[in-house]
A protein has these predicted regions:
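Hydrophobic/aromatic anchor residues within beta-strands of the central parallel beta-sheet
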Residues: 103, 147, 205-208
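Conserved glycine-rich cofactor-binding loop
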Residues: 54
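NAD(P)H-binding glycine-rich loop region in Rossmannoid oxidoreductase-like domains
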Residues: 60, 64-75, 91, 99, ...
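Conserved Rossmann-fold NAD(P)-dependent oxidoreductase catalytic core, especially the SDR/UDP-sugar
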Residues: 1, 128, 132-193, 198
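Strand-loop microenvironment adjacent to phosphate/nucleotide-handling motifs in alpha/beta enzyme folds
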Residues: 38, 196-409
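Helix N-cap at the beta1-alpha1 junction of Rossmann-like dinucleotide-binding domains, i.e.
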Residues: 77-82
Length: 409
């Protein structure tokens, strides 16, 4: 069945995206404006390597750098298709730069990537946006191990390569889920932060923790676009609220941390009247109303699937809003804990967590050796990895429910 409407919020106006998440203005306008000349000067004289540059946040960061005319901008991502779209997007929006702009479809964990760095490793700034970000990726031990490789060990490796090549600065993304983590994804980023502390004694590293990026690839809101195009029900939890930033805001936050962050700084969006919690179900309702549909609440998955064949012609869309009961869902969000030191005065809408280089070498070695042994055996269980995570993070709030998002619509 042809969908009655092809709609993509990313290509729609920023105003629409902002109104869906309950805002009228971009969060970081004043900070970007205040530092725009300094940003332009630094970027135009610098070389950049963006890793994971074809994901939603990676594309946003790449565009923020590109539009300020860098001397050199090389982008690496494992997704060949997303990389093609990034280049098309940049050429269509900004055109060309005087500097050297190239993209490479490489796996950061591969030998080919290491050869690329050996041949082309001279960059002032290295930004790593690659991650396995989904809570559902902890459902099986094999994807979970890949999450550890991507989120922890690839980060550690690429920092060492940056140190060896004499880079000025390394930036990578953490997550709000690293503050008091309750899922393996958040915990993997918390462990990554521990490894960063060790490497920060050899080079300047800054990071960012931020909220959900509205309509980023693979996100629930991005799924709304897909469901409409495929004429399928809209499904969302009605008991989970999140902070949302737009893709452009995610790029600005990363860029500000990369350029202006001091060693071990973690940047995050300040909570304000503009940035407030909003539920997925509320966004779903606004989203459908923007498209001219009235939400029709269903009781079961089967009812919603069946009604998707008939309701759209009546100007209604089937929705299933239920309570969340899957492993790893955090019912609130936080960017910092009460144990962390904050600088809330340097920027208008950006907060900064200040860190000393605190880490336990024995714990990091234990983690490396334990994972290495599991890999050598070619056999491991999720329970083994969870136990190791609890050793690394004693107050880890993980609760296994046995239910995962892959078993739900």
């Amino acid at each position: 069945i042809d969908c009655p409407i092809q709609f993509n919020i990313k290509s729609n106006s920023m105003t629409n995206a902002l109104s869906l998440i309950g805002r009228t203005e971009m969060l970081f306008n004043s900070d970007i404006k205040q530092h725009q000349n300094e940003l332009a000067d630094i970027i135009s004289e610098s070389s950049f390597l963006v890793l994971g540059g074809a994901g939603s946040i990676g594309q946003a960061v790449t565009k923020e750098i590109f539009k300020r005319n860098p001397k050199k901008l090389h982008v690496v991502d494992i997704s060949e298709n997303n990389m093609v779209e990034l280049v098309r997007d940049i050429r269509s929006s900004f055109g060309y730069i005087d500097g050297d702009f190239q993209t490479f479809a490489l796996d950061i964990g591969s030998l080919e990537y290491d050869a690329f760095i050996k041949a082309d490793g001279k960059f002032d700034y290295v930004l790593n946006l690659s991650a396995l970000k989904h809570v559902r990726s902890e459902k099986d031990p094999y994807t979970l191990m890949r999450m550890i490789d991507v989120n922890v060990f690839n980060t550690d490796k690429t920092i060492q390569q940056s140190i060896d090549a004499g880079a000025k600065k390394y930036f990578c993304v953490s997550t709000d889920k690293a503050a008091n983590p309750v899922n393996m994804m958040g915990a993997s980023k918390r462990i990554m932060e521990m490894f960063l502390m060790r490497k920060s004694e050899q080079m300047a590293i800054s990071t960012a923790r931020f909220a959900n990026v509205a309509f980023s690839d693979g996100s629930l809101l991005h799924g709304f676009n897909q469901r409409i195009q495929k004429r399928q029900p809209i499904v969302a939890p009605n008991d989970i609220k999140r902070y949302f930033v737009t893709p452009q805001e995610s790029g600005e936050l990363c860029l500000m941390s990369c350029i202006f962050g001091e060693n071990r700084d973690i940047f995050f969006p300040k909570l304000s009247e503009a940035l407030h919690l909003i539920s997925f179900a509320d966004i779903a309702v606004k989203y459908l109303e923007q498209l001219g549909y009235e939400p029709y609440l269903c009781e079961t998955e089967e009812e919603a699937r069946q009604l998707a064949h008939t309701l759209p012609e009546q100007g209604k869309w089937p929705c299933l809003f239920t309570a969340s009961d899957t492993t790893g869902e955090k019912d609130f969000e936080e960017f910092f804990t009460d144990k962390e030191e904050l600088d809330m005065s340097r920027f208008t809408n950006l907060g900064i967590i200040k860190n000393d280089p605190l880490y336990e070498q024995e714990l990091l070695s234990l983690f490396e050796n334990s994972i290495s042994e599991m890999k050598d055996e070619r056999a491991w269980t999720k329970e083994q990895i969870v136990k190791l995570f609890f050793t690394m993070i004693p107050d880890f709030g993980h609760k296994e429910t046995g239910k995962y998002l892959d078993s739900k619509m």
